[in-house]
Amino acid sequence: MEGGGGGGGGGGGGGGGGGGGGAPYATRTAEEVFRDLRGRRAGMIKALTTDVEKFYKLCDPEKENLCLYGYPNETWEVTLPAEEVPPEIPEPALGINFARDGMNEKDWLALVAVHSDSWLLSVAFYFGARFGFDREARRRLFNMINNLPTIFEVVTGAAKKQAKEKTPNSSSKSNKPSSKVQSKAESRSKSKLSAPKDEEGSGDDEGEEEEDDHDNTLCGTCGTNDGKDEFWICCDNCEKWYHGKCVKITPARAEHIKQYKCPDCTNKRTRA
């Protein structure tokens, strides 16, 4: 077994990369499964970028079928696949080490990245099926995943290129709904508003930019910008926007909140 980056953190060696030795799983939400995926993803990105020299050496073509595992605690490991059949959770691509010396290093890393992306999706939706996610939960999970750059995009540099292309067209408040919306709620604090309806379209450039800004606004919980006619609320601490229904805040309740903190910011303060 080849270790890497503090490997066994999420589930123990090649035994499924995060399974837990056959112990039953507690029910999880889409957000919890997403956090699991995000940790595994961070570990695999680390293996293919900052720890790439160590990863390259561990993938010796002379050894048996090796796999790259990512763990929920943002560590990674190169090791043999699980011995149990069927495995506790889906397995990553086998034999990533065999192609190492027959390809350009960048191409090989990109290939491993593609297979890693595929594995993350399979693990996430395995959990979705195991925990009985309904259509709405599966949609939330997919949208949250889709808002992250893929491992392939990070490893090949495509993620940075996309970010640079977006920057010139986005304002400093591109993550918030348009100022038209805020003007509708001037009697409220900046954190409380309803999502915009297409009003009085003036057709000028400024209006188009504001519309683009709102189109780019994503709910911090479900990761979508669906429900443009629904109530939204902004966290005064992290300035992320949320569907009211996702954080269980109604317009009536929002009227009495002087400073709103989202669940993530509230939990951080509690832990501190």
Swiss-Prot record:
Basic and acidic residues compositional bias, start-end: 183-200
Organism name: Oryza sativa subsp. indica (Rice)
Top-rank lineage group of the source organism: Eukaryota
UniProt cross-references to InterPro entries, sorted A to Z: Alfin (IPR045104), Alfin_N (IPR021998), PHD_AL_plant (IPR044104), Zinc_finger_PHD-type_CS (IPR019786), Znf_FYVE_PHD (IPR011011), Znf_PHD (IPR001965), Znf_PHD-finger (IPR019787), Znf_RING/FYVE/PHD (IPR013083)
MF annotations from Gene Ontology: histone binding; transcription cis-regulatory region binding; transcription coregulator activity; zinc ion binding
Compositionally biased residues, Acidic residues: 201-214
Main location group: nucleus
Family, per entry: Belongs to the Alfin family.
SUPFAM superfamilies in UniProt: FYVE/PHD zinc finger
Domain notes: The PHD-type zinc finger mediates the binding to H3K4me3.
Bias type Gly residues, positions: 1-23
Chain ranges of zinc fingers (PHD-type): 216-268
Listed name of the protein: PHD finger protein ALFIN-LIKE 6
Cellular compartment(s): Nucleus
